């Protein structure tokens, strides 16, 4: 950083001083952000130490008498519960009737002249049965001829999930669902099994998970990969993940690899598909291979490898994400505060982009053709005005400043940010992909890194089926249980059309694996 003397500063003109002050403000904000982050980390560490100290203190304490509770009622506003909501929440669950009666002797004393029974008072409570383990003991009946001619006949038996293994479809489905739906690492599941007297090591469970994905569930994944190409628009994103072993070679501290995600744009008559694709790098070869037979538009966050693919192929377009264009302005406003940001370039940019996006949202219920028409009529000039304004402001400020970098992102992405104007199928943002990859990033916080490249590939398949199942509103455990029950029985089939009957939106799956999730 160049340091100017007092004399040099006195000789500078007003414009130069404005540029220097603007640059110093940006540097100050950046340093403040770093300081806040460091303080937050320190605070988290202190909280963890306090929590550990408290746990040790509690463990060493003598049991004390439970204190009496004095109820204090504080008047507050409570939203009135919708009539029948509890009944709706409990509907469809298995029910058991618990009768509360009086004995004939008690009734005879109270009613010496006889009695009649009135309608019972009915109320409901929710009961839970913790995990229950049952041993399936199979008895395969064997028959022999009475003539002792050596003929022996066995009853047919279903094919095992794995040879000489105690694993059942329901058990493996529960493990997969725990890890990939509920972000519960295998180590924690192993401890939970142990508390129930079941010894299942993490290695055993990991082998079951990888084999299930590789041998059986990959068939569904491959079919979904074929079907996602039917979409006109695919959203794409990627997120890093560390892998400890690549092709059996152990890497100290793990290798930084990437989990790519692809999600189709669901319009009327289409089914949502979410596909994860693990790859050892962020190289353009990976999306090139995944999208090799796709023709249409890919919505991304501006990563240049997608732009490279679009330049290679005439049948592939790339659309930008306006939320990514708006985000740095929003972060700047948050860092300095709303009051300070009033009238700033960041506030003006944020307002202009937000207005365009809000207006586009009003076209959601229109047909593709009508949406394109309205965008051309209503939004085209506003988009033109935004880019003209951005270029003008960029020429007036320090290019390396926070706002300068935010403006240049929009300017560099202009070609891709404009694509939505000419295609009613294309949205203004890449939210589909960001929402699809979020469960993976949550799970990653728990498992930190993946043990092997085989495990990473299996994880891609399993996250794909979980997120596609959720998007199609089916129960993920029931779905995995069905798949692991049915697919092994078809492994010798040359005709793979049975797979379509097991896709998340098939009538059979929708009937057998309904989700009880209700949108509030």
Segments predicted by a language model, with ranges:
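Short, flexible loop/hinge motifs at secondary-structure junctions
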Residues: 1-166, 206, 235-236, 242, ...
């Amino acid at each position: 950083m160049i340091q100017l003397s007092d004399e040099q500063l006195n000789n500078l003109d007003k414009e130069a001083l404005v540029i220097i002050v603007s640059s110093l403000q940006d540097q100050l904000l950046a340093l403040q952000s770093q300081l806040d982050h460091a303080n937050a980390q320190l605070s988290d560490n202190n909280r963890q130490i306090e929590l550990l100290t408290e746990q040790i203190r509690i463990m060493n304490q003598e049991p004390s008498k439970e204190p009496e509770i004095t109820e204090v009622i504080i008047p507050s506003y409570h939203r009135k519960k919708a009539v029948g909501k509890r009944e709706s929440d409990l509907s469809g669950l298995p029910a058991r009737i618990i009768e509360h009666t009086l004995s004939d002797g008690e009734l005879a004393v109270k009613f010496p002249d006889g009695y009649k029974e009135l309608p019972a008072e009915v109320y409901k409570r929710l009961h839970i049965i913790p995990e229950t383990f049952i041993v399936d003991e199979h008895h395969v009946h064997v028959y022999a001829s009475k003539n002792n001619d050596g003929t022996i006949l066995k009853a047919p038996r279903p094919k095992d999930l794995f040879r000489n293994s105690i694993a059942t479809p329901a058990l493996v489905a529960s493990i997969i669902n725990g890890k990939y739906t509920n972000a519960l690492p295998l180590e924690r599941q192993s401890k939970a099994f142990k508390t129930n007297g079941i010894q299942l090591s993490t290695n055993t469970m990991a082998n079951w998970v990888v084999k299930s994905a590789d041998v059986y569930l990959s068939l569904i994944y491959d079919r979904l990969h074929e079907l996602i190409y039917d979409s006109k628009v695919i959203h794409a994103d990627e997120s890093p993940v560390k892998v400890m072993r690549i092709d059996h070679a152990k890497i100290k501290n793990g290798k930084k690899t990437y989990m790519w995600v692809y999600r189709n744009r669901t319009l009327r008559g289409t089914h949502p598909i979410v596909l994860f694709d693990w790859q050892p790098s962020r190289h353009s070869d990976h999306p090139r291979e995944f999208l090799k037979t796709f023709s249409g538009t890919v919505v991304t966050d501006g990563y240049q490898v997608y732009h490279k693919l679009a330049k290679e192929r005439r049948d592939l377009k790339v659309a930008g994400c306006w939320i990514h264009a708006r985000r740095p302005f929003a972060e700047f406003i948050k860092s300095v505060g709303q009051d300070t940001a009033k009238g700033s370039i960041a506030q003006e940019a944020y307002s202009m982009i937000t207005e365009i996006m809000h207006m586009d949202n009003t076209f959601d219920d229109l047909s593709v053709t009508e949406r394109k028409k309205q965008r051309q009529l209503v939004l085209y000039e506003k988009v033109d005005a935004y880019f003209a304004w951005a270029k003008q402001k960029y020429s007036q400020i320090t290019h390396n400043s926070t706002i300068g970098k935010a403006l240049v992102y929009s300017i560099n992405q202009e070609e891709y940010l404009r694509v939505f104007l000419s295609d009613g199928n294309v949205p203004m943002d890449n939210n589909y992909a960001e929402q699809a990859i979020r469960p993976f990033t949550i799970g990653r916080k728990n498992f930190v890194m993946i043990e092997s490249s085989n495990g990473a590939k299996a994880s891609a398949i399993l996250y794909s089926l979980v997120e596609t199942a959720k998007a199609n509103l089916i129960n993920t455990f029931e779905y995995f249980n069905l798949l692991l029950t049915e697919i092994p029985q078809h492994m010798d089939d040359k005709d793979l059309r049975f797979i379509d009957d097991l896709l998340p939106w098939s009538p059979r799956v929708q009937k057998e694996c309904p989700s009880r999730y209700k949108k509030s």
